[in-house]
């Protein structure tokens, strides 16, 4: 995929490890997800105003995201996900949280939680939230944890996801690290996705 934010091009893979069974002999589904992002911004944009006492390095354009997707259809109307995740960015500009003096870090863990509540056969309420464990993201006035809430509409051939969120990016490499807006300040965006399953 490609995102305008940071001019990020990304590729990903997903591997299903376990499949939940209807009799709950296997109560969860488990999948491994990983993505690599490459920013094709100019090097001046990547390095910003930093005084460089090092050589420019093409590797600084890359970032990586890895996640386990632990999901369960708890009942006919409730599904839940836990998303332990790890983010690594090869290069970051120096930044300090003014509230706790913690420095931003290249790599850190986060935990996502997601859920779906089915109202009818075709209409569901959906939501997800990510909490970043690095001290830099705790009580930070400039960076917030991303939260999205919305509805999912199934029309037979397509699935429409309509949601409100404080995140700007659509892919993990952007929204986990760079969500600057706050729900409490009314800084909310509306977005939608359309999914279509093809069988060959």
What positions do the PLM features span?
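Hydrophobic, lipid-facing positions within transmembrane beta-strands of outer-membrane proteins
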Residues: 9-11, 64-68, 109-113, 145-149, ...
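Outer-membrane pore/translocation modules
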Residues: 1-106, 175-185
């Amino acid at each position: 995929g490609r995102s305008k934010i940071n001019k990020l091009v990304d590729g990903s893979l997903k591997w299903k490890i376990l499949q939940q069974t209807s009799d709950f002999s296997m109560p969860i589904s488990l999948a491994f997800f990983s993505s690599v992002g490459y920013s094709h911004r100019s090097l001046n944009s990547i390095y910003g105003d930093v005084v460089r006492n090092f050589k420019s390095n093409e590797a600084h354009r890359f970032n990586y995201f890895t996640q386990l997707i632990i999901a369960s259809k708890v009942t006919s109307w409730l599904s839940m996900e836990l998303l332990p995740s790890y983010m690594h960015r090869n290069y970051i500009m120096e930044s300090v949280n003014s509230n706790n003096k913690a420095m931003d870090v290249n790599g850190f863990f986060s935990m996502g939680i997601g859920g779906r509540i089915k109202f009818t056969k075709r209409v569901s309420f959906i939501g997800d939230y990510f909490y970043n464990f690095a001290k830099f993201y705790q009580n930070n006035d400039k960076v917030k944890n991303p939260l999205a809430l919305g509805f999912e509409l199934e029309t037979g051939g397509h699935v429409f996801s309509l949601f409100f969120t404080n995140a700007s990016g659509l892919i993990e490499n952007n929204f986990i690290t760079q969500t600057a807006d706050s729900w409490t300040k009314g800084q909310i965006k509306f977005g939608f996705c359309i999914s279509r399953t093809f069988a060959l």
